[in-house]
């Protein structure tokens, strides 16, 4: 009986579901020199319904930080930031951006720092690395519904080392564009991230877009998404298309000029906007705001297209020269812009402090009775309470500010403030002449070594031939010297074997003298007797 129970228990354990074991190639979080830091395995959870990947719970200095959700529009572009620890190992590592599936466990490389770009993403994807700042940025343009999916940005020689997963979504609505007609003298275009709350007089996540022309303004109640309101000269309410927004994503979606546009829902108040060339008085009730603008004839264009700004290669911002085109990725306050009221993009790439980047959302100051809304180190707007009723536009050109000021702040730590980040990278990143000089030794760089291999082989052959010729020459010279020496020895031996007469011994010399004939003797031959 006990044996039967044991067999039943063993059989039941064999039918139990096997526990999922981690894949061996996911055990390493990063390619550290000592290979001693193992990755702490987490649970499988989706960052979105489309992206299932094991998230890293490894909080070591090699962990990556960035946005988990990226949203864009069809035909637009998105910019993705991946922060990493600026250590000596990570600076020289390969940076990559890949797409998961199909199958789901394979991540196909789209672009990497080894000068590799997938053929399907040519001319519309770029990866820029900033080793000194611990950041690399990926920009994908010409978005389409086919780009929806899960992506990984990571560091390492393979696509399964140190990575961060994210989900890319494309909104269903079309991209918003400015009207094709030339703006009139009294037109003012404003777009903003965030919606106005009439109760607390503060901003909540969302996007409010307001297009106004003429002297009368109508508004639409603020919604958590993106609302668009157009006001005509007759003062009728014309609500535009509404599209969803993804607050707190930490990435940028390119659109038109964006600026804070508060929607007054409080008791009647008056606001005043002052600039060098235009003066507007804003009078509002619960449902309407009146805008009156006066401008001279030579300053009839009042839209914030920023066409008169100098282009800075350091920021890579494309500015549309025509009002009908989209102005890419601009975040700033509304202003009655003229030729003398142009924003300047500072040519520095110095990161701002985290406190400065967090100041991009308006906060209520009870002592002063005012709240401030601005972007990091760029433009600061001060909006007075109904008692003050004054808008003051000023530009804070701080020495530490730049369009890329919030790149060093971790996107995942900012939450909804990430929607107020600075202008995305459209062109080359970083100051000119300071490009990355990182040495890379990866499979894509083997072409240079293959080119140098034949040259080194030829040099080795030439050296070998020279050594052989030199050895033969030395051998011939040595052989000739030995031949001369042998000849000299033979001649000396011959002279010793055949001595002269004066060198013979005394007895032999006497015998030779005795055998010689006397001086008077002569030899005579006998005469023959001739016969008869």
From Swiss-Prot:
One of its GO terms (cellular component) is plasma membrane. Residues 295-311 have a biased composition (Basic and acidic residues). N-glycosylated. Induction: Up-regulated by IFNG/IFN-gamma in mesangial cells. Residues 220-232, 268-293 have a biased composition (Polar residues). Residues 472-532 are cytoplasmic. Residues 1-16 form the signal peptide. It is a single-pass type I membrane protein. Keywords: Adaptive immunity, Cell membrane, Disulfide bond, Glycoprotein, Immunity, Immunoglobulin domain, Membrane, Receptor, Signal, Transmembrane, Transmembrane helix. PROSITE patterns: IG_LIKE. Glycans are attached at residue 167. GO terms for biological process: adaptive immune response; signal transduction. It comes from the Eukaryota. The chain crosses the membrane at residues 451-471. This is High affinity immunoglobulin alpha and immunoglobulin mu Fc receptor. It comes from Homo sapiens (Human). The gene is FCAMR.
